């Protein structure tokens, strides 16, 4: 972990998230900020043709499933949440409460690098609200509002 640059490598991510192959959707955190004004995180997911779901989605024209873009965004949100409150206790997770206003703007294909930007908005009654944006080469792929609860 490089705290000076506020980055996390895969080993750091594995300490925070319970997900493992083939469902770990964050490869690296390239930046996070935990100031009073804002709490944000930028992560990347390298989309490889070797991902198992490309065998069926779709064999003639592989497309990264939209639900997995949202999952990647949610995992980035989980990392941000744990960076805000510290390393999780054993068995402690952030669970999805809702995804709202999800919009998909273009397909993601093998070879793309998905950039995930998430931002903490607020917490109310134990439910935290975040916003997320996914881009490829600076082009908007997906945006959504995510809510989660720590359990």
Swiss-Prot record:
InterPro entries: FabA_FabZ (IPR013114), FabZ (IPR010084), HotDog_dom_sf (IPR029069). The active site is at residue 57. One of its GO terms (biological process) is fatty acid biosynthetic process. Its main location: cytoplasm. It is found in: Cytoplasm. Its EC number is 4.2.1.59. The keyword Cell inner membrane does not apply. GO terms for cellular component: cytoplasm; membrane. GO terms for molecular function: (3R)-hydroxyacyl-[acyl-carrier-protein] dehydratase activity. It catalyses: a (3R)-hydroxyacyl-[ACP] = a (2E)-enoyl-[ACP] + H2O. It comes from the Bacteria. Keywords: Cytoplasm, Lipid A biosynthesis, Lipid biosynthesis, Lipid metabolism, Lyase. The keyword DNA damage does not apply. Belongs to the thioester dehydratase family. FabZ subfamily. HAMAP family: FabZ. Involved in unsaturated fatty acids biosynthesis. Catalyzes the dehydration of short chain beta-hydroxyacyl-ACPs and long chain saturated and unsaturated beta-hydroxyacyl-ACPs. This is 3-hydroxyacyl-[acyl-carrier-protein] dehydratase FabZ. It comes from Tolumonas auensis (strain DSM 9187 / NBRC 110442 / TA 4). The lineage of its organism: Bacteria, Pseudomonadati, Pseudomonadota, Gammaproteobacteria, Aeromonadales. The gene is fabZ.
């Amino acid at each position: 972990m490089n705290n000076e640059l506020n980055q996390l490598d895969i080993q750091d991510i594995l300490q925070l998230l319970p997900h493992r192959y083939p469902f770990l959707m964050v490869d690296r955190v390239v930046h996070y900020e935990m100031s009073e004004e804002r709490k944000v995180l930028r992560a990347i997911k390298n989309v490889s043709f070797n991902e198992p779901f490309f065998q069926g989605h779709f064999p003639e024209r592989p497309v990264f499933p939209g639900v997995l873009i949202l999952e990647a965004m949610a995992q980035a949100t989980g990392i941000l949440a744990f960076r805000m409150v510290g390393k999780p206790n054993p068995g402690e997770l952030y669970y999805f409460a809702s995804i709202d206003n999800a919009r998909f703007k273009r397909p993601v294909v093998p070879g793309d690098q998905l950039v995930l930007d998430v931002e903490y908005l607020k917490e109310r009654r134990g439910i935290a609200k975040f916003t997320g944006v996914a881009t490829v080469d600076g082009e908007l792929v997906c945006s959504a509002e995510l809510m989660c609860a720590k359990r």
